[in-house]
Swiss-Prot record:
Name of the gene encoding the protein in the UniProt record: murG
PANTHER family: GLYCOSYLTRANSFERASE, UDP-N-ACETYLGLUCOSAMINE--N-ACETYLMURAMYL-(PENTAPEPTIDE) PYROPHOSPHORYL-UNDECAPRENOL N-ACETYLGLUCOSAMINE TRANSFERASE 1
Gene Ontology biological-process entries: carbohydrate metabolic process; cell division; cell wall organization; lipid glycosylation; peptidoglycan biosynthetic process; regulation of cell shape
Protein name: UDP-N-acetylglucosamine--N-acetylmuramyl-(pentapeptide) pyrophosphoryl-undecaprenol N-acetylglucosamine transferase
Localization, UniProt: Cell inner membrane
Molecular function GO terms recorded: UDP-N-acetyl-D-glucosamine:N-acetylmuramoyl-L-alanyl-D-glutamyl-meso-2,6-diaminopimelyl-D-alanyl-D-alanine-diphosphoundecaprenol 4-beta-N-acetylglucosaminlytransferase activity; undecaprenyldiphospho-muramoylpentapeptide beta-N-acetylglucosaminyltransferase activity
Record has Transferase as a keyword: yes
Top-rank taxon, per record: Bacteria
Pathway annotation from the record: Cell wall biogenesis; peptidoglycan biosynthesis
Keyword Membrane: yes
């Protein structure tokens, strides 16, 4: 670190939905010459993932209360006090010019201590329904940013920071016009899989005639791939050129861009990535998400005719088969264009600019 180099502290952890957008901003700031330090939980995924990106870590131990037992709730005051002390110590060691909160349990004690220490705090809410931590911290933050309009009062709509390759894909109109033959459908269950999709999609395909069936790429998560293969075999399909079953996908930008339709859950980053690429989507929100935020995330696109939203309780093989019969590449291309029009491809740069400005930096350092 040089005497003139400014420092950004990113506080985020727990899930990829918090960590990956934080990493996108961190790398953008590093490219502009900033020093970046990450504040996370030693038990979270960030403790393993972030150091692989060459970013130094500071740690705070703090967990959530939802669904926890009486013992956890009784020890909350002690754990919160300890986390506040750890947060203050980290802030004193790092001495950041600005702190960016991207979500996760540790954001609460660290955000409180950031505000009390007089350092500028920038918050970013990834979901369409803000969590309790950000609702509280928004009262003390210098700038409040949201991925979906209306998630927090008096906030700036920047979108979700995403990987550059997702924002740089060819326009939907050109991609769809270049294709012929069966529709290309990508089914994404995520790293944990989505049992409802894994069961319903094969049965829906079996209800279609050979001429109606799309080509399928179905990602199920490593723990669910064998069960997925069994589901397709039970429906009369063997993995081959028209049915590809995979545990994970390395290049999601290419997978999204090659699809005419994506069938998936509606986590914040998934919705943002689909809009950035511009691809039609059928969202099946995870029914047990906190505050049912996945339904609200999906509705952002669905209400604009840019996607279709089906609740898991309503999803059936019959419904999916009937809906697929009614789709054409042209209708899906129209949906994809609407989706792309709602994207915020400059989100990473915009969040970085806000952080720089909050620290009193010249925005020309983020060219």
């Amino acid at each position: 670190m040089t005497a003139s180099q400014r420092t950004l502290m990113v506080m985020a952890g727990g899930t990829g939905g918090h960590v990956f957008p934080g990493l996108a901003v961190a790398h953008r700031m590093e490219a502009a010459g900033w020093r970046v330090v990450w504040l996370g939980n030693p038990a979270g995924m960030e403790a393993t993932l972030v150091p692989k990106h060459g970013i130094p870590m500071e740690y705070v131990r703090f967990g959530g209360l939802r669904g926890k037992g009486l013992k956890t709730k009784l020890t909350l005051p002690f754990n919160l006090l300890r986390a506040c002390g750890q947060s203050l110590a980290a802030l004193r060691r790092v001495r950041p010019d600005v702190v960016l909160g991207m979500g996760g349990y540790i954001t609460f004690p660290a955000g409180v201590m950031t505000a009390l220490s007089g350092r500028p705090l920038v918050l970013h809410e990834q979901n369409s329904i803000a969590g309790l931590t950000n609702k509280v911290l928004a009262k003390f933050a210098k700038r409040v940013l949201v991925a979906f309009p209306g998630a927090l009062p008096h906030a700036e709509w920047t979108g979700n920071p995403i990987r550059a390759e997702l924002a740089g894909t060819e326009a939907p109109k050109a991609r769809y016009a270049a294709r012929s033959g069966p529709l290309n459908v990508l089914v994404v269950g995520g790293s944990l899989g989505a049992a409802a999709l894994n069961e319903v999609v094969p049965r829906a395909l079996a209800m279609l005639t050979p001429g109606e069936r799309p080509r399928i790429v179905h990602q199920a998560g490593a723990k669910h791939i064998e069960a997925l293969k069994a589901n397709y075999e039970a429906a009369g399909f063997a993995a081959g050129e028209d049915v590809r079953l995979v545990p994970f996908i390395d290049d999601m930008a290419a997978a999204y861009a090659a699809a005419d339709l994506v069938i998936c859950r509606s986590g914040a980053m998934t919705v943002s990535e689909i809009a950035a690429v511009g691809v039609a989507a059928l969202f099946v929100p995870f029914p047990y998400a906190v505050d049912d935020h996945q339904t609200s995330n999906a509705a952002f696109l669905a209400d604009a005719g840019a996607a279709v939203l089906v609740q898991q309780r309503d999803l059936s093989a019959e419904l999916l088969a009937d809906w697929l019969r009614g789709q054409s590449r042209a209708s899906l291309a129209d949906m994809a264009e609407r989706s792309r029009s709602l994207a915020k491809p400059e989100a990473t740069d915009e969040v970085a600019r806000v952080c720089a400005k909050a620290a009193g930096a010249n925005l020309e350092t983020l060219q």
